[in-house]
Amino acid sequence: MKVLLIGSGGREHALAWKLAASPLLEKLYCAPGNPGIAAVAELADIGVDDHAALIAFAKEKHIDLVVVGPEAPLVTGLADEMRAEGIRVFGPSRAAAQLEGSKGFTKDLCARFNIPTGAYGRFNNAPKAKAYIRQQGAPIVVKADGLAAGKGVVVAMTLQEALDAVDSCFEGAFGAAGAEVVVEEFLDGEEASFFCICDGKTALPLGSAQDHKRVGDGDTGPNTGGMGAYAPAPVMTPEMVARTMRELIEPTMRGMAEIGAPFSGILFAGLMITSDGPKLIEYNTRFGDPECQVLMMRLNSDLLALINAAVDGRLDEVSLEWKDEPALTVVMAAEGYPANVKKGSVIRDLEKLESIDGVKLFHAGTALKDGAIVAGGGRVLNITATAATVAQAQARAYEALKLIDWPEGFYRSDIGWRAVEREKANR
């Protein structure tokens, strides 16, 4: 099969690596890709938002399957446009991608189909949003309705913080994404990410992960797209997984079909595990980044065969095989991230990681300049490891990371701390 993968991050490098291992694969292309992906795929210099050029490329190369990595092209309807041209594509329709593209859409769906989530209000102007906030009190959560690259959420611990968040949304901090805000109840508990692959009818669990959103050690500093992750999430016990499928995922699949937008693709539930059980924080309609990296490290099954089954509506025939060991990934980011990122610094000694057992390096925001690997974005490298325990995977990842010569890079030194503490307590 000839496959076109769309995207350029660490998530896409992990997908490319796994797709390249499939015996079904004849040729892998990636648009636009990155220097790490170039080792397993032929790169095409086409941006993820250039739908017409992506469609033309898929036709020219007789592509059998398109796999869409990031959320933005899905929310703007790339999958629909490709299907209209007769191209097989893995990813939700524009209508189904509203689960990620509009927080308000998802909250309304939860209300209609009795999916557990926090109480909420939707507002298209600041005075009404502020009145609701004053009525509810803090802590409270303020979210831009649309796509804001994981940065449009403020968990306000004080009333003033919440009111300021409303102002920044309506003053255009997130562009069109902030034209409407969702204000919702603060949920107390432990967060987890839960992933399913879906074919419109069936949702097959791909397991859980926990990511680390804040930039600094001890969960301090501003939110980011994610500074590291591990899988599985210990809080997602077999009972919690069963409840999540029964109370959240299955009603969502039924609800989306009922409103005429059946969901196929990756459904990523951001959960809060509360004393009452799982509640939905948000849905994403693609793999998480960096959660995808740890899921791919643990997946033994053929990813391409799995995606084919999803595209063909055959997931009810599929069973998956996973490694028993946990996986953990640490993000190395460029100086200044998540604010003003300094690009162009040279990264050396990456080849030293190639021979380490149980370690895989995924490229995210890397670029090639004069034959050298340089920082081309905010989150740049993902050092990923598997081992018998999370503590051992953590040690392995940090040991490998220290071999990289990149003074301008930084990372959190405590990725996996929750699971490591649990392991110690359970000894």
From Swiss-Prot:
Pathway where this protein functions: Purine metabolism; IMP biosynthesis via de novo pathway; N(1)-(5-phospho-D-ribosyl)glycinamide from 5-phospho-alpha-D-ribose 1-diphosphate: step 2/2
Entry-linked SUPFAM superfamilies: Glutathione synthetase ATP-binding domain-like (SSF56059), PreATP-grasp domain (SSF52440), Rudiment single hybrid motif (SSF51246)
Chain ranges passing through the membrane: none
Domain ATP-grasp, residue spans: 107-312
Residue numbers binding Mg(2+): E282, N284
A Pfam family hit: GARS_C
Protein name from the UniProt record: Phosphoribosylamine--glycine ligase
Keywords of this entry: ATP-binding, Ligase, Magnesium, Manganese, Metal-binding, Nucleotide-binding, Purine biosynthesis
Keyword Magnesium: yes
Residues bound to ATP: 133-193
Cofactor note: Binds 1 Mg(2+) or Mn(2+) ion per subunit.
